[in-house]
Amino acid sequence: WLMIIEQKCNIIVMLAECVEAGKPKCHKYWPNDNMEETYGIVSVTNKEEIKYCGFTRRILLVSAKLKDGSVLTTVTQYHFTKWPDHGVPQTTSAIIRMHREIMKANKDLIGQSPIVV
């Protein structure tokens, strides 16, 4: 989360599930819907979670008290949920729709910020 704040990232893209084929693949780094979690000096609140066919969009409010002041920013996470444990998705429609939404959201942001994948 400190990297997200430092680099002023507004979009995170996640292409994997946390557990695939019964094995952990990724640590869940966000709180459940309408919940807050603290990760070190960073607090993350899941303000909104919208499930689409093939992906979930989460609006995360990220805050931290740093040496040089407090930071409060909004980060949107796009979580692709249709990738099978092995192989590739049967169709590309869900990932293309998610990609289009990410590109539109990034274009609408003021200033440039890297997208974290």
From Swiss-Prot:
InterPro entries: Prot-tyrosine_phosphatase-like, Protein-Tyr_Phosphatase, PTP_cat. It holds the Pfam family Y_phosphatase. GO terms for molecular function: protein tyrosine phosphatase activity. Substrate binds at residue 85. It comes from the Eukaryota. Signal peptide: none annotated. This is Tyrosine-protein phosphatase 25. It comes from Styela plicata (Wrinkled sea squirt).
